[in-house]
């Protein structure tokens, strides 16, 4: 019989559901079973959008009044890749030599299992003077269109308001509790299309090669750093991700070149001011080249939901930091490094922090978590829940 206070049992049950985005594969059904046994009211809305898969989500709530703590996460996982590369099958949740193997062990079914077990332990000993909810999506590893962003709006329309949120993403690096995330850099992407005129390489005067202009545009974007970072954020960085002419012939001047890039930006910028800076740099190159003549460029911005943010709720950060210290003996580092997460949506509704297992093996073959790390995180979550409602 499954024991709700045992995070390993819960985690094994979740891993055995092959919930690769956007498939639910029984993961939310397992969660619903756990949570209903604990007294939660559970709903599972399905969201749709054009050109996307339908995605099932879960919202569970307990309590009627007082401070409202949200735990947020996702049950969807990335594909396991070649099964023969795994030491153990990725959806069998095998335990060997002090580790639990399986896709989603750390990203992030482990965090969900630890929080549920921690809450079950708290409820065995005392009642909570407040409200607890779990906001769990099946669309975090995919497009994130039919997941947390819509689930938050759906819950808000039902009258839900939150005091604070904890996202159980794998933020720890070497040991559980060494790092918590109190913010994230923003993310924005663009596509530069340089239009030229195709021709034979032996007759360049009859063509307009887009590559020299593309090189100048790239230099304008990358030669000067966007900034040097701030007190809470590392420097913004622009990275080229694709340079493509679609031309496989060595004797043909291509008709166009496409350059794709992504920028991770800190709190010195807004999305608007950053776009202005990029457009300014590019326009200066075009003016020097030949305005309105071949070759010329076009810039397209890709819609992004990843704005920069920083949580400044000292009480929330302090409660979590003290809970970590009470279990591990050390205070965590407060960080804003790394990629984006669904915290970028939650920050519009309440203060949010992120804290979970060490993530060294996430998205990798043989993704795994140490058994003692699972117990440590559960103990920290338990202490955090108790202290949050004091």
UniProtKB/Swiss-Prot annotation:
Record-linked InterPro entries: ArgE/DapE (IPR010182), ArgE/DapE_CS (IPR001261), Bact_exopeptidase_dim_dom (IPR036264), DapE_proteobac (IPR005941), Peptidase_M20 (IPR002933), Peptidase_M20_dimer (IPR011650), Peptidase_M20A (IPR050072)
Catalytic activity, EC: 3.5.1.18
Keywords, comma-separated and alphabetical: Amino-acid biosynthesis, Cobalt, Diaminopimelate biosynthesis, Hydrolase, Lysine biosynthesis, Metal-binding, Zinc
TM regions (residue ranges): none
Gene Ontology molecular function, alphabetical: acetylornithine deacetylase activity; cobalt ion binding; succinyl-diaminopimelate desuccinylase activity; zinc ion binding
Pathway info: Amino-acid biosynthesis; L-lysine biosynthesis via DAP pathway; LL-2,6-diaminopimelate from (S)-tetrahydrodipicolinate (succinylase route): step 3/3
One Pfam family here: M20_dimer
Catalysis performed (reactions): N-succinyl-(2S,6S)-2,6-diaminopimelate + H2O = (2S,6S)-2,6-diaminopimelate + succinate
Record GO biological process: diaminopimelate biosynthetic process; L-arginine biosynthetic process; lysine biosynthetic process via diaminopimelate
Record keyword Transferase present: no
Cofactor note: Binds 2 Zn(2+) or Co(2+) ions per subunit.
Cofactor: Zn(2+); Co(2+)
CDD domains: M20_DapE_proteobac
Residue numbers binding Zn(2+) 2: 107, 141, 363
Annotated family: Belongs to the peptidase M20A family. DapE subfamily.
Annotated HAMAP family: DapE (MF_01690)
NCBIfam families the record matches: DapE-ArgE (TIGR01910), dapE_proteo (TIGR01246), PRK13009.1 (NF009557)
Purpose of the protein: Catalyzes the hydrolysis of N-succinyl-L,L-diaminopimelic acid (SDAP), forming succinate and LL-2,6-diaminopimelate (DAP), an intermediate involved in the bacterial biosynthesis of lysine and meso-diaminopimelic acid, an essential component of bacterial cell walls.
Complex formation: Homodimer.
Name of protein: Succinyl-diaminopimelate desuccinylase
Gene: dapE
């Amino acid at each position: 019989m499954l024991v709700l206070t045992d995070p390993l049992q819960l985690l094994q049950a979740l891993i055995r559901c092959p919930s690769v985005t956007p498939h639910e594969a029984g993961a939310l059904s397992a969660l619903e079973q756990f949570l209903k046994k604990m007294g939660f009211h559970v709903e599972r809305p399905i969201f749709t959008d054009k050109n996307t898969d339908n995605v099932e989500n879960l919202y569970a709530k307990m309590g009627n009044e007082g401070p409202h703590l949200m735990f947020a996460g996702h049950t969807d996982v990335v594909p396991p890749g070649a099964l023969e590369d795994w030491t153990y099958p990725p959806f069998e949740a095998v335990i060997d030599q002090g580790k639990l193997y399986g896709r989603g062990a750390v990203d992030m079914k482990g965090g969900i299992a630890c929080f549920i077990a921690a809450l079950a332990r708290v409820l065995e000993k005392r009642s909570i003077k407040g409200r607890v909810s779990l906001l769990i999506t099946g669309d975090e590893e995919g497009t994130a269109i039919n997941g947390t962003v819509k689930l938050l709006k759906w819950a808000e329309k039902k009258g839900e308001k939150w005091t604070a949120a904890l996202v159980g993403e794998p933020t720890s690096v070497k040991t559980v509790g060494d790092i918590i995330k109190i913010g994230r850099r923003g993310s924005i992407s663009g596509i530069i299309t340089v239009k030229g005129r195709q021709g034979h390489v032996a007759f360049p005067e009859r063509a307009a090669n887009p590559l020299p202009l593309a090189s100048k545009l790239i230099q304008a974007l990358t030669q000067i750093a966007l900034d040097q970072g701030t007190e809470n954020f590392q420097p913004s960085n622009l990275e080229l991700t694709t340079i493509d002419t679609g031309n496989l012939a060595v004797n043909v001047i291509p008709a166009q070149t496409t350059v794709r890039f992504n920028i991770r930006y800190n709190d010195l910028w807004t999305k608007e001011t950053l776009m202005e800076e990029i457009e300014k740099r590019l326009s200066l190159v075009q003016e020097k080249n030949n305005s309105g003549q071949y070759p010329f460029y076009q810039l397209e911005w890709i819609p992004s939901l990843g704005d920069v943010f920083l949580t400044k709720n000292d009480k929330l950060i302090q409660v979590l930091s003290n809970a970590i210290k009470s279990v591990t003996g050390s205070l965590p580092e407060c960080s804003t490094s790394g990629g984006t997460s669904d915290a970028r949506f939650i920050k519009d509704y309440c203060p949010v922090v992120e804290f979970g297992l060490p993530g060294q093996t996430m998205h990798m073959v043989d993704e795994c978590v140490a058994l003692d790390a699972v117990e440590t995180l559960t103990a920290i979550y338990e202490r955090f829940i108790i202290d949050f409602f004091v």
